[in-house]
Amino acid sequence: YILTGKTGTKSVLSEFKINSVKKYKIESSYKPVSFEFTINRAIIFPFNKEMHSLIRYQNLLSFDVVDVYDSKYSTNIGATTDHLLKCKNKKDFLIKNIKDIYWDNFDTLILGHLDELSNLTGRTNLKKDLIQQAIAKGKNIYAFDEIPDCNGSNIFYPIINKQSLPPDRFGMLYRISKPVVGIFGTSSRQGKFTLQLKLRELLLERGYSIGQIGTEPSALLYGMDYVFPMGYNSSVYIQGFDVIRYTNYIINILCQKN
């Protein structure tokens, strides 16, 4: 470029741009996946597998669970959480019918997966109706499944997509400077997330400063730093190297913080 008279920085860069094969726009809309509202008193519905840990590990929550609801079709109504979980927990709850929900007793609805319950009852609009009621009552909603038709600062569901990606580093990765423990399994119902919670509980009790990425949509409720909901009804929409790019980026942030 010097031979062609392009000697200034701007001129050389301009020439590079003209002769480039492909142009990359360096921008990113990355922001941590997190909810903006404060939870003080929450109810959970329904009381299915994904909700059990919220009762077992109440000590990891920064808020109070005040009621547990389910559908009459689940056969759980009238039973206690200790009885169903076959263990004694911090607080035992009598499971109530969602039709008798007491709206004045809580500020946040933690809404679990409802597809199986909807199929069982034939009520395909079950989730929609409950969300509309919660919105009308001014309640926060933390949902495990996507509710794309509903937006607002008091509605949250975890999702990882292209908009979640950090700036492109063209294949370069951060060097991980802290020990990392990974929990892996080959199928469902192996207790992978339960083990994540148990390790969190034990390490915090021993005074360790930890950073954590949870693999269930409820992860942020326990104070985990990031959520990567890759389990049942996964809402992760990135694949291949994008997954490596994303997880390497957030692990690097955790290394710097802890």
Regions found by a protein language model. Give the residues of each.
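Flexible phosphate-sensing "switch/lid" loops adjacent to ATP/NTP-binding sites
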Residues: 1-133, 149, 163-182, 189, ...
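Hydrophobic beta-strand scaffold residues
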Residues: 141-142, 210
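Hydrophobic positions on the alpha1 helix immediately C-terminal to the Walker A/P-loop
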Residues: 195
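Rossmann-fold NAD(P)-binding glycine/threonine-rich loop
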Residues: 147-158
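A short helix->loop->beta-strand "cap" motif at the edges of active sites that frequently abuts
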Residues: 134-141, 153-154
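Active-site signature of alpha/beta-hydrolase-fold catalytic machinery across serine-
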Residues: 198
